[in-house]
């Protein structure tokens, strides 16, 4: 079993959802970002999504756009992001780590080279937000052939006819974007989330993670009662933006992660 399968199976036995945390690689700088990454599992993160900085993150809201700018201004590259995963893996062989971003940097890096290096450094899966199923041959199929999970996004506008196409070839988990729009947007109603999870379960046995708009332990707990995973990104990244310095940013992100984890773990 993959690390993602193992983690979700373990949490299912514990009757709780996973806390899935998103941070951008290299934000606010390489050293602080690595410190955050290494600290997330102990703070309560069950799965980590690590953003690959890109100059045009069109699916992301202001918080993550600014995180991309901070990271790129600090010299973060795809090669440095892969190196960061390598350094993380030297001390953690159990926490699933997924790279999330856009196809352009991967294409420029070289798809074969990227897949080989991602697998070698210990990446478990990929979320590539601008690559629809019609382009599975470009990255999804080669990545899965190498043993990487390929996680698809579904949204409130993904209809029942489209869902099987989106889910075909998905692995690891399904990421349901509970608000149509950019990351960090307003949260969806719990009734809407419950209906969406029920609809997705009719189409897939994969774990379902819910993201976009989750900012507090209370909200995380409410979503954790309905889904297999609770994805939080913008709220964590806001802590970096608002911190007085990088050392404070590390503390603040890990503190919020701890609060969210407590909410998720006490939800059921």
Swiss-Prot record:
Pathway entry: Amino-acid biosynthesis; L-tryptophan biosynthesis; L-tryptophan from chorismate: step 5/5
Protein name as catalogued: Tryptophan synthase alpha chain
SUPFAM superfamilies: Ribulose-phoshate binding barrel
Gene Ontology CC terms: cytosol
Oligomer and partners: Tetramer of two alpha and two beta chains.
Family: Belongs to the TrpA family.
The entry's keywords: Amino-acid biosynthesis, Aromatic amino acid biosynthesis, Lyase, Tryptophan biosynthesis
Active site: 49 (proton acceptor), 60 (proton acceptor)
Catalytic activity, reaction form: (1S,2R)-1-C-(indol-3-yl)glycerol 3-phosphate + L-serine = D-glyceraldehyde 3-phosphate + L-tryptophan + H2O
Example of a GO MF term: tryptophan synthase activity
Keyword Lyase: yes
Domain of life, source organism: Bacteria
InterPro entries named among the record's database cross-references: Aldolase_TIM, RibuloseP-bd_barrel, Trp_synthase_alpha_AS, Trp_synthase_suA
Function description: The alpha subunit is responsible for the aldol cleavage of indoleglycerol phosphate to indole and glyceraldehyde 3-phosphate.
Family matches, as CDD domains: Tryptophan_synthase_alpha (cd04724)
HAMAP family per record: Trp_synth_alpha (MF_00131)
Enzyme Commission no: 4.2.1.20
Disulfide bonds: none
């Amino acid at each position: 079993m993959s690390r993602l399968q193992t983690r979700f199976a373990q949490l299912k036995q514990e009757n709780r959802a996973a806390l899935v945390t998103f941070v951008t690689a290299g934000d606010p700088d390489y050293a602080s970002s690595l410190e955050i990454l290494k600290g997330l599992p102990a703070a309560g993160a069950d799965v980590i999504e690590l953003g690959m900085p890109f100059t045009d993150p069109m699916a992301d809201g202001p918080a993550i756009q600014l995180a991309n700018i901070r990271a790129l201004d600090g010299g973060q590259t795809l090669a440095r992001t892969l190196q960061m995963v390598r350094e993380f893996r030297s001390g953690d062989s159990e926490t699933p780590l997924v790279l999330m971003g856009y196809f352009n940097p991967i294409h420029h890096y070289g798809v074969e080279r990227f897949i080989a290096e991602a697998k070698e450094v210990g990446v478990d899966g990929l979320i590539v937000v601008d690559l629809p199923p019609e382009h599975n041959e470009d990255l999804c199929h080669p990545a899965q052939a190498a043993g990487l999970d390929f996680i698809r996004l579904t949204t409130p506008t993904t209809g029942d006819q489209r869902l099987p196409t989106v889910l075909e070839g998905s692995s690891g988990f399904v990421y349901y974007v509970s608000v149509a729009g950019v990351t960090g947007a307003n949260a969806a109603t719990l009734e809407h989330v419950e209906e969406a999870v029920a609809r997705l379960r009719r189409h897939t046995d994969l774990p379902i993670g819910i993201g976009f708009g989750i900012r507090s332990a209370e909200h995380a707990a409410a979503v954790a009662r309905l889904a297999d995973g609770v994805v939080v990104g913008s709220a964590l990244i806001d802590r970096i933006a608002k911190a007085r310095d990088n050392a404070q940013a590390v503390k603040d992100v890990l503190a919020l992660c701890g609060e969210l984890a407590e909410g998720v773990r006490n939800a059921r």
